[in-house]
Every structure is written in C-alpha cells, then in structure tokens.
Amino acid sequence: MRQDGRKQNQLREVEIIPHFTKHAEGSVLISVGDTKVICTASIENRVPPFLRGQNKGWLAAEYSMLPRATGQRTIREAAKGKLSGRTMEIQRLIGRALRAVVDLEKLGEKTIWIDCDVIQADGGTRTASITGAYVALVLAVQKAFAEKTISAWPITDFLAAISVGILPEEGAVCDLCYSEDSQAKVDMNIVQTGSGDFVEVQGSGEEAVYTRSELNELLDLAAEGIDQLIHIQRPFLGEAASWIEEKKGT
C-alpha cells in the first residue's frame, strides 16, 4: 500500500476544467492530485523564420512555475534573466509531444503556442502539463476549425503522459506524487498516443539499476494509466473526439 493508500496502478484524482481563461483560444486547469497546472493554447498568424513561405505551421511550448508552487519560494526565472536547464528541457518535451499528433502542414502558416503554468506542484508537473495542454490544444484548434481559419483538421491522435517508478517497498507504481518521486529508485516519464505508440520515454535509476522485466512492467503500468487519462480527456473534446478517432493511427 502506498503512502496515500493508492494501489500500484491507481492514478491520483484528475480534474479538468475547460475554458479556464477568457482570452486564449483554448485553455484548461488540470489538477492531478495536488499538482495544478493552467494550460493555454494560442494561435498566431505567423511562423518562425525557418518556415516562412512553406505553407506549414509550427507548435511551440513554454513552461513555468509560480514562485510558491512548491514548499519553499523559488525566485522567478524572469528575475534571474535566464531559464533553468530543467525548464528548457520540460518545455521542449511538451512541444515535441504535442507536435507528434499534429499535422503541421494542415495548420497553414500559423503557430500554436502552448503555455503551461504550474500554480501548485506535488510531482508530475511535466506529465500533467502535457495531458492538460493536449485538451487546450484541441479546444483551440476546434475553435479555429469552426471559424474556418484552419481549413483541414490537423490533430491525428489522442495524447497523454504519466510518471511511473519503482519505490523501495512498494515496487512499480504509476503517477508518483512528490514524496514518492523523491525516494524512487527508478523514475520515468512516458508520453503515449491513443494508438498506443510511444512519443517519449524518459527514465533513469537513482543510485539503482533496473531490469528489462522491470522496464516492461513500468511501460505496462504507464500504458494502463494513459488509457485512463485519455478516457478522462475525451468528454472535454466534444465533437473533435470523433474526428480524432477517425484519424487515429493514420
């Protein structure tokens, strides 16, 4: 039994509040246990210089944490004048993950900006960001599609992310909170599509090694958890869920 009483394969409580902000084309507040992230998707009618004239779009992501999202206040990175390596790694991960399920050529010369702002952190902020940002992305694209500013549906599959790990006593578990993550022997972040294909597998041992069979067990736990997360996402996608289902795996 885990510290909070969950089973090995049990997610924390997940809540998604759509249209959480007024101005963004798509937005959600996602809560995964005590981790809370505001995710917005904004559409701009321009692309980076390297894509100009190619009639192809782009998707990029930014990630940040409020100073008191954690137990001790941290200095804003804007005040430091530079992003930390962790922040750069996470926002690149979010961008890569979402681009994997977007046909960029169908965006035209548009950029979709994903912003993930952690307002409270208790482990799994990057995976919660991806899961929430996907819903915000679909809401934004659905709005643009209805307004005919995007002429062809570009999102090709469902997407979610989860953490898994190996704890000293409990063994393999999914969706680690901070106290579990801080003592995990092995920690992984998995991003997977609704078709079951992997987008990203980030994993490492902490003064420990793990076997191929343990890796397989972690991947199976992640796949089960991601299926549950996609099931939670779907009601918020509206009619777009059926369009994505048609395109899934194509």
From Swiss-Prot:
Its EC number is 2.7.7.56. The keyword Nucleotidyltransferase applies. It catalyses: tRNA(n+1) + phosphate = tRNA(n) + a ribonucleoside 5'-diphosphate. Disulfide bonds: none annotated. GO terms for biological process: rRNA catabolic process; rRNA processing; tRNA processing. It comes from the Bacteria. Phosphate binds at R86, G124, T125, R126. Coiled coil: none annotated. SUPFAM superfamilies: Ribonuclease PH domain 2-like (SSF55666), Ribosomal protein S5 domain 2-like (SSF54211). The keyword Acetylation does not apply. One of its GO terms (molecular function) is tRNA nucleotidyltransferase activity. Signal peptide: none annotated. PROSITE patterns: RIBONUCLEASE_PH. InterPro entries: ExoRNase_PH_dom1, ExoRNase_PH_dom2, ExoRNase_PH_dom2_sf, PNPase/RNase_PH_dom_sf, Ribosomal_Su5_D2-typ_SF, RNase_PH, RNase_PH_bac-type, RNase_PH_CS. Keywords: Nucleotidyltransferase, RNA-binding, rRNA processing, Transferase, tRNA processing, tRNA-binding. Phosphorolytic 3'-5' exoribonuclease that plays an important role in tRNA 3'-end maturation. Removes nucleotide residues following the 3'-CCA terminus of tRNAs; can also add nucleotides to the ends of RNA molecules by using nucleoside diphosphates as substrates, but this may not be physiologically important. Probably plays a role in initiation of 16S rRNA degradation (leading to ribosome degradation) during starvation. Homohexameric ring arranged as a trimer of dimers. Belongs to the RNase PH family. This is Ribonuclease PH. It comes from Shouchella clausii (strain KSM-K16). The lineage of its organism: Bacteria, Bacillati, Bacillota, Bacilli, Bacillales.
